[in-house]
Amino acid sequence: MTDVLTRYNSGKLWDFDGGIHPPEMKSQSNSTPISTALLAEDYYVPVKQHAGNAGNLLVKEGDYVLKGQPLTLGDGLRVLPVHAPTSGTVVAIEPHIAAHPSGLSELAVHIHADGKDQWRPQNPTEDYFTHTPERLIEKIYRAGVAGLGGAVFPTGAKVDAALGKVKLLIINGAECEPYITCDDRLMRDYAAEIIEGVRILRYILRPEKVVIAIEDNKPEAVNALRTSLQGANDMDIRVIPTKYPSGAAKQLIYVLTGMEVPHGQRSSSIGVLMQNVGTAFAVKRAVINDEPLIERVVTLTGDKIPHKGNQWVRLGTPIDFILKHVGYQPDNRFPVFVGGPMMGLIVPDLRAPITKTANCLLAPDHFEYDPQATEQACIRCSACSDACPVHLMPQQMYWYARAEDHEKSNQYQLMDCIECGLCAYVCPSHIPLIQYFRQEKAKIWDIEAKARKSEEAKIRFEARQARLEREEQARKARSQRAAAARREELAANKGEDPVQAALARLKAKKAGEAPETGGSAQGAPHIKTIRTEKGQSVPDNSEITALRRARRLARQQTNGNSPVSSASNSDSATISADNTHSTPKTAQNQTAPDPKKAAVAVAIARAKAKKAAQTTTGETVTENVTEKTAQNPTAPDPKKAAVAAAIARAKAKKAAQATTGETATEKTAQNPTAPDPKKAAVAAAIARAKAKKAAMLAESEKK
């Protein structure tokens, strides 16, 4: 393939397909030098004025700012800062109406000017050759310089991405759209500064060739630039035929080199980089004068504007303020355009501010503006395809855009559309094709943005899963190493498992016995265990619990005041004596007394005490009644008869209780199971109450 420089050096100019020659209407505004617009009282500076994301705010409400002071700062070359257009106070930071047909609002910094227009401290650069290209790119970025030809792509990022790749640097001065003359007047009035800005770009990029391309309808601009070069041959000025849209990047590259930029790639892929003349001027001001991009040249034209021309307008100035000072009278019948008649946008609210994208304010009257005709059905005439300079098929893209068939729209290369407006200009059905294409692009971009977010989330999830897997593998590896270390320790200890030995010592400590530290686990005392519902092995504390209950019941019996207590004490003494006699055997067997047997013995003692108390009380009552009856052999007294009946019932009850007690005692002896301590305590209390009642009854009878 022929090299781009070879084709350029041939001196030939190529002609692209399509294109038109609309009425230029440039003479309305290019006859007078650029003037300076009046300072407004209030400025509304949008925080995002470029193709990219907005930066982070550096100011807040109530702050005083100086002219050129940064209001935002990004975290990369693609996030451009914005600057204060004049000195004043930040009144608010809130959404403000944007210069867009949608009429939507965007975040803006509202600055109330103090009228002093005082600059922040500046550090001009006298010799930029003493700085590295990277340092100059940083200065361009911090000045907020973006492409002023319409795309507003961050200049610093664009230049940085093309380092070492550029063979041909093209400075675009074609300005092909009707009515717009801001670049024409800039080249006439500031040719020397534009040349200096081009040389700065050449120093950074180091291309082999530099060319300034201008349409042949701007002879004054061509002469001004050639005069400023003063015979220097470090750059060329090449005049090209006037044809719309020869100022578009891909079309201008084809005109100069005959080469097309591949689909989906940038011009740097073929060794070409393009910048606008206004961008070159802004680069010079940023590097040499240390002035950020806070103003730009705006063309004020249209028959509704009496004082036409080009003005330096501060960014953030309300559009209605500018139009008011050039004699514009609002008229609802005719809209105001930001941009030219081919690619411009209608502004629904004139309070919207000027931004870096605004190169023209067009206010036509009834001689220049036709009311929008009624849209009709497409007749498949192919006029749009014939006029398209990018070799697209607008009629097909129109159908797919209306059907929201995004896949087909991409297949027909909708994203290659430069939105020049030619298809809508030549359409006999008056179909606003560019509006359909812009809406379809926005939908596709939104879908792609969501897909990117989803993919990023997927990548984060997979990275997290991989991290968790690595951690799990590391944990398993640590466990395996620990197990291997335990096996080695077990082998070193001659078969004694250190874990089992530690568990044995812990169990021995809980049982109140000192573990043998130096011995093996087999030498530790045997500890009874039971199984829980979950299958875990825990120590069996039932014997200790029964022993504690027996001791508590014994203390309760000892502290009692009834005869039962005395009997219980005597029986307890008997049991203690028996236990004392059995002590040698216990010592011989080296076994502690069985708590279950102790509990059974206590229960038997309580039963015997209860029986003795009932027997004694019954005999005393019987003897007293018999004696009184023998001494007084008279007719039976009803009271005595009742007493006798009660005595009989008491004897019968006593006999029954004695029989039940003996049976229970025998069963208890046969089945050595510890009685329920609560029931035993209740029974003992009832027995004491009955014995006390019987004793009181016997005393009353004696009296």
Curated annotation (Swiss-Prot):
The complex is composed of six subunits: RnfA, RnfB, RnfC, RnfD, RnfE and RnfG. Keywords: 4Fe-4S, Cell inner membrane, Cell membrane, Electron transport, Iron, Iron-sulfur, Membrane, Metal-binding, Repeat, Translocase, Transport. Residues 485-497 have a biased composition (Basic and acidic residues). The keyword Nuclease does not apply. GO terms for cellular component: plasma membrane. It is found in: Cell inner membrane. Residues 578-592 have a biased composition (Polar residues). This is Ion-translocating oxidoreductase complex subunit C. The keyword Protein biosynthesis does not apply. [4Fe-4S] cluster 1 binds at C378, C381, C384, C427. GO terms for molecular function: 4 iron, 4 sulfur cluster binding; electron transfer activity; metal ion binding. Part of a membrane-bound complex that couples electron transfer with translocation of ions across the membrane.
